[in-house]
């Protein structure tokens, strides 16, 4: 009550921010006449002037009015477009850590030039982030003439670039890039084996276009660089035969309910759970197939891999639908982005799910991967010193932007009043009645020459509706993942009088639908258009444009409500751009996913009773409340999921930050001998503590065991017992000192033999190689810990606290293992001549070059609710060659190729054969 009264008196926070910014707009407008009077050279010189003033201590905020006036005038001269006042407001909002909600058609691309120019003056680099390659290239080419006129360099960073080109792209003042490529380059930089291989500068300012898509929809998407793991395709094929025999039951077993099925589904969380009966059936089948021993259980440690395969196969068959979640294209499973309806070539689900779907569809099963490096978009974008974003739909997620990223959302008013007519939702009893009503609405629009855009939630639904329109004899275009290549042409024609376009979700987002069609697209089709041809096309377009305006603009039909209000608003936002007329209406049915999953049976039955005649339509305030309630539940559920993930990922993020920071220190230093000396002392102290416990009696010392350990692990043949017999004054501390001094002396002897420069390079290489290998294993261990940690809740323990505690312990153990492994390797390496160490270094550098070449192969483009991966791994032979070049491999050691066999039975035997 009091808040409402205060808002009426003082205005909302958004209104107060806009009032403050409008005062600065007046200053910019006042500068306009003087900037119009400047010559081109004088206008260009402003950039150097601003940079000098920054160096002299002025702030970006102080420079902002003049900088914005400079960009506005340059844009008028170079692009023929003058920034509206609301675009200046948007630019000011984006200059700092804020999100600007700007409606479709309000010129976000032009608005972005203002904060990009201002922040690029610092010389630290600006990243403009888009959701796909096409938009990155388009926006860069659109704004390049403006920025280059003002003395700013512009580059595009997309997958597949040559390393040197990519490196130059990051050196540009303003770099346009996709979100996935920025994330993968960050991970690649932290796998580099020399400082020169890195691409990125410190992350300064990112302006994220379609920020809701990237920071909300993609928030849980981990970017993963991975290498191949063991092949288990035969097992996926075998277990795929088991799943069809399992029977679904209504809900999970509990004290109150005992079903007769083999599994139950949790559609909200996309989980499938075996019942006790189902578990028993699976175990019997596995025993029959010879995949499990009769006395074993699926839950025993040795069979967890089998359980993992069954879980993946069950989810593949029951929760992932063809033409909804994925399509089969050229013998491969291609994921469909649930938010945009676009396919994402090269993206793969993790945890064996992708392989299980490949087995289900009978296509070639590709190998599983082991994570080498990963980061989520949530944590990657929080690395930027300054982060800002723009979208047409942010206000509904304002709380999450503030909570997770510390970004305030400011709603920017439209340049012209919005006159779109958003009609009340209509509900039908079932999908067939709903489709019938949609077809009647489309027929009415066609009769009045009004273009229609029909939004569907999946490829499957778009094809069902398309079939219904074909049956009704209505010509139309379909824009979904299957027809992705024709997207630009379909969108260009979607504004024609009477055109009917069906689009999955927000396919085509980022491209405006022009009323009357896109005349520029028509001109582009002509090889060498004459002035007369262009003029004729413009005249024809103007007639069509006027006809569509008269008919009411673009009409939007939503075939069902989405889980998020934001997605609904995005669909509506395609109409009514820049003050154009338009209309929208959502058609719903009780069969819709939102109703089935998020409304209880009681509410659904109550609503069914409200329909008294076949095909009856219902629209009421109650309906609006029910839908709002269901969407609020989904949004809250999804927010909790993202927040929960972040709490877990923050633990891994702290560790990642520590490892990558240490790695960069290693890369930037040619001499790490002091670090090696400190590690050696730590390692030997720890080893000695195992056999000579601190402050213990001499009778408790295990001297023979200590001598053996020093001999086997560090090739130190020290007569410790003889020392003790010969010197009565030798006590714990002096003995410890003598052992460490002996280790240092032996290492010094090797260094004199090999040469300091070669030894420094070798130390750095071994340190990086060992760190990467152990970090990779640590990531796998963290994944396993994360997957099972929720079970601690049954023991009345907080899973998050348990995860933090155990992951910290694992991290500490990894660092101890790193120290031991590095010192053990350096101690055991055989060094006889300068030539030998140089040959080992040459082989190591060759192996690293091969690994780097694999990492820089073209990456899959684009993000979704899956995990994008990139391969980077040496062959088994290269691994063995690299280790053999560094040291002698014992016959009974595990083979370095990773097979799990002893060296003498694996590559050791092959080496013998070749000898």
Curated annotation (Swiss-Prot):
Hydrolase listed as a keyword: no
Subcellular location: Cell inner membrane; Cytoplasm
Record-level Gene Ontology MF annotations: ATP binding; metal ion binding; protein-exporting ATPase activity
Membrane topology recorded in Swiss-Prot or TrEMBL: Peripheral membrane protein
Binding site for Zn(2+): 895, 897, 906-907
Name of the featured protein: Protein translocase subunit SecA
EC assignment: 7.4.2.8
Function text: Part of the Sec protein translocase complex. Interacts with the SecYEG preprotein conducting channel. Has a central role in coupling the hydrolysis of ATP to the transfer of proteins into and across the cell membrane, serving both as a receptor for the preprotein-SecB complex and as an ATP-driven molecular motor driving the stepwise translocation of polypeptide chains across the membrane.
Highest taxon, organism lineage: Bacteria
Family: Belongs to the SecA family.
Biased composition (Basic and acidic residues): 876-891
Taxonomic placement: Bacteria, Pseudomonadati, Pseudomonadota, Gammaproteobacteria, Pasteurellales
Cofactor: Zn(2+)
Sites where the protein binds ATP: 87, 105-109, 512
EC class of the enzyme, as a word: translocase
Feature: compositional bias, Low complexity: 849-864
Self-association and partners: Monomer and homodimer. Part of the essential Sec protein translocation apparatus which comprises SecA, SecYEG and auxiliary proteins SecDF-YajC and YidC.
Chemical reaction(s) catalysed: ATP + H2O + cellular proteinSide 1 = ADP + phosphate + cellular proteinSide 2
HAMAP family tied to this protein: SecA
Pfam families: P-loop_SecA (PF21090), SEC-C (PF02810), SecA_DEAD (PF07517), SecA_PP_bind (PF01043), SecA_SW (PF07516)
SMART domains named in the record: SecA_DEAD, SecA_PP_bind
UniProt keyword terms in alphabetical order: ATP-binding, Cell inner membrane, Cell membrane, Cytoplasm, Membrane, Metal-binding, Nucleotide-binding, Protein transport, Translocase, Translocation, Transport, Zinc
One GO term of the biological process aspect: intracellular protein transmembrane transport
Cofactor note text: May bind 1 zinc ion per subunit.
Chief location category: membrane
Cellular component, GO annotation: cell envelope Sec protein transport complex; cytosol; plasma membrane
Region called Disordered, residue ranges: 849-915
């Amino acid at each position: 009550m009091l808040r409402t009264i205060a808002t009426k008196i003082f205005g909302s926070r958004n209104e107060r921010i806009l009032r403050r910014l409008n005062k600065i707009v007046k200053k910019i407008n006042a500068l306009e006449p003087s900037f119009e009077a400047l010559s081109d050279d004088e206008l260009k010189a402003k950039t150097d002037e601003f940079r000098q003033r920054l160096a002299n201590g002025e702030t970006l905020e102080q420079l902002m009015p003049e900088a914005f006036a400079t960009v506005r005038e340059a844009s008028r001269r170079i692009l023929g477009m003058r920034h509206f006042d609301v675009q200046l407001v948007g630019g000011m909002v984006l200059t700092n850590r804020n999100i600007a909600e700007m409606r479709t058609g309000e010129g976000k691309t032009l608005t972005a030039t203002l904060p990009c120019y201002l922040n690029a003056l610092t010389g630290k680099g600006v990243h403009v982030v888009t959701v796909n390659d096409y938009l990155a290239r388009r926006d860069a080419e659109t704004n390049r003439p403006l920025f280059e006129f003002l003395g700013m360099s512009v580059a595009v960073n997309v997958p597949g670039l040559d390393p040197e080109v990519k490196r130059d792209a990051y050196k540009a003042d303003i770099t346009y890039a996709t979100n996935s490529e920025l994330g993968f380059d960050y991970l690649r930089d932290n796998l580099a084996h020399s400082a020169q291989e890195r691409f990125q500068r410190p992350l300064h300012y990112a302006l994220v276009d379609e920020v809701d898509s990237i920071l909300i929809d993609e928030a849980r998407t981990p970017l993963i660089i991975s290498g191949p793991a063991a092949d288990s395709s035969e097992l996926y094929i075998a277990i795929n035969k088991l799943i069809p025999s399992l029977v679904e039951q209504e809900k999970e077993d509990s004290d109150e309910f005992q079903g007769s099925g083999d599994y139950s589904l949790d559609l909200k969380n996309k989980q499938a759970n075996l019942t006790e009966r189902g578990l028993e059936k699976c175990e019997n089948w596995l025993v029959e197939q010879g995949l499990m021993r009769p006395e074993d259980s699926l839950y025993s440690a040795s069979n967890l891999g089998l359980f993992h395969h069954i879980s993946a196969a069950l989810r593949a068959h029951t929760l992932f639908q063809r033409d909804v979640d994925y399509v089969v294209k050229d013998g491969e499973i291609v994921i469909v982005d649930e938010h945009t309806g676009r396919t994402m070539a090269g993206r793969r689900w993790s945890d064996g799910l992708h392989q299980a779907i490949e087995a289900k569809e009978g296509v070639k099963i590709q190998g599983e991967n082991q994570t080498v490096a990963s980061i989520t978009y949530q944590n990657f974008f929080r690395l930027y010193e300054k982060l800002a974003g723009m979208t047409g739909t942010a206000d509904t997620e304002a709380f999450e932007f503030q909570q997770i990223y510390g970004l305030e959302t400011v709603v920017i008013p439209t340049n012209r009043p919005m006159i779109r007519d958003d009609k009340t939702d209509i509900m039908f009893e079932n999908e067939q009645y709903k489709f019938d009503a949609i077809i009647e609405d489309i027929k009415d629009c066609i009769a009045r020459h009004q273009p229609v855009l029909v939004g569907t939630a999946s490829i499957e639904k778009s094809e069902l509706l398309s079939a219904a329109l074909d049956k009704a004899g209505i010509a139309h275009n379909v824009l979904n993942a299957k027809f992705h290549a024709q997207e630009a042409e379909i969108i260009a024609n979607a504004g024609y009088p009477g055109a009917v376009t069906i689009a999955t979700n927000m396919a085509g987002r980022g491209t405006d639908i022009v009323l009357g069609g896109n005349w520029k697209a028509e001109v582009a089709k002509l090889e060498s258009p004459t002035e007369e041809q262009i003029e004729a096309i413009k005249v024809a377009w103007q007639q069509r444009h006027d006809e569509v305006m008269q008919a009411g603009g673009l009409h939007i039909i939503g075939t069902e409500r989405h889980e998020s209000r934001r997605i609904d608003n995005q669909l509506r936002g395609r109409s009514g751009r820049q003050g154009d007329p338009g209309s929208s209406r959502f058609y719903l049915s009780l069969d819709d996913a939102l109703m089935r999953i998020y409304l209880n049976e009681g509410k659904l039955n109550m609503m069914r009773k409200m329909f008294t005649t076949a095909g009856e339509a219902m629209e009421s305030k109650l309906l609006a409340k029910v839908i709002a309630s269901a969407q609020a539940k989904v949004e809250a559920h999804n927010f909790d999921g993202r927040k929960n993930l972040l709490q877990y990922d923050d633990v891994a993020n702290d560790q990642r930050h520590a490892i990558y920071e240490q790695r960069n220190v290693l890369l930037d230093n040619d001499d790490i001998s002091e670090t090696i000396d400190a590690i050696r002392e730590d390692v030997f102290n720890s080893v000695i503590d195992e056999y000579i416990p601190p402050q213990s009696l001499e009778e408790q010392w295990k001297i023979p065991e200590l001598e053996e350990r020093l001999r086997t692990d560090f090739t130190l043949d020290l007569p410790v017992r003889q020392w003790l017999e010969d010197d009565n004054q030798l006590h714990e501390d002096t003995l410890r000192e003598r052992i460490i001094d002996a280790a240092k002396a032996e290492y010094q002897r090797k260094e004199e033999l090999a040469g300091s420069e070669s030894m420094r390079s070798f130390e750095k290489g071994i340190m990086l190689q060992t760190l990467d290998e152990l970090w990779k294993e640590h990531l796998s261990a963290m994944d396993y810990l994360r997957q099972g940690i929720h079970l601690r809740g049954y023991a009345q323990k907080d899973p998050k606290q348990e995860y933090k505690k155990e992951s910290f312990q694992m991290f500490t153990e990894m660092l101890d293992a790193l120290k031991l492994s590095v010192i053990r390797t350096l101690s055991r390496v055989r060094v006889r001549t300068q030539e030998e160490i140089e040959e080992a270094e040459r082989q190591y550098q060759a192996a690293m070059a091969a690994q780097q070449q694999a990492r820089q192969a073209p990456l899959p483009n684009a993000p979704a609710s899956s995990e994008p991966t990139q391969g980077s791994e040496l062959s088994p032979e290269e691994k063995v060659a690299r280790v053999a070049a560094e040291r002698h491999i014992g016959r009974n050691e595990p083979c370095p190729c990773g097979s799990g066999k002893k060296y003498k039975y694996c590559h050791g035997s092959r080496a013998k054969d070749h000898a």
